[in-house]
Amino acid sequence: MSDMGGNTNVYEVLPQAHPEAVVVYCGDPRLQTAFEPFIARELGLRKGQFIPVVVGGGAGVLANPERLPKEFKFMKDRFELIHRAFPSVQRAVLINHEDCIYYRMLAEKIPGFVTDDMSKLRHRPGDDMDLIAGIFDRYLSYLGLKAELYYGRFADVEHSKMAFDRVLAVTS
């Protein structure tokens, strides 16, 4: 409902959008101040040039389709919807990060999650990122998106700064 008294705030929108990427990253509130400038500066994507998919666990949601089928289906459905609605999207940027609350929650809720070789709680970029790249390639390659993987790591002992490393994942 609009305010008829003239106090309605009005915000700018893009009349047409032709995004070139979908960027999947974590909703952890501690890290939002790092994600936004990383996407703009290092990925070269301004608002309207990408579709943000912000979910707990970020790209990690793609890592375990057998153990977390509902979460995987949610992400797969989003990629398919985006592909249909925005054929201009050519890139899928998948971001994971150190000290993920989502991973800790899974370790507490799913027995064996931390001890199972396929789904250990991981802290090195290549580990889960290779798995995510392989799953993306196996289940979503038909969309024709170029996958780019990044891992956020804390850059100081206070955990107040984050750096993002490009991960060259190995898929089998």
Please provide the spans of the model-predicted regions.
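Short glycine/proline-enriched loop/turn "hinge" motifs that connect secondary-structure elements
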Residues: 43-45, 85
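A short, structural micro-pattern
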Residues: 17, 46-47
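Short, contiguous, well-structured surface segments enriched in hydrophobic/aromatic residues
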Residues: 49-56
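Loop/turn elements at helix/coil->beta-strand transitions in domains of secreted/extracellular proteins
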Residues: 49, 88-91
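Short Gly/aromatic-enriched secondary-structure transition segments
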Residues: 36-43
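Divalent-metal-activated hydrolytic enzyme cores
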Residues: 1-35, 56-77, 81-87, 101-172
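Histidine-centered catalytic micro-motifs
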Residues: 91-99
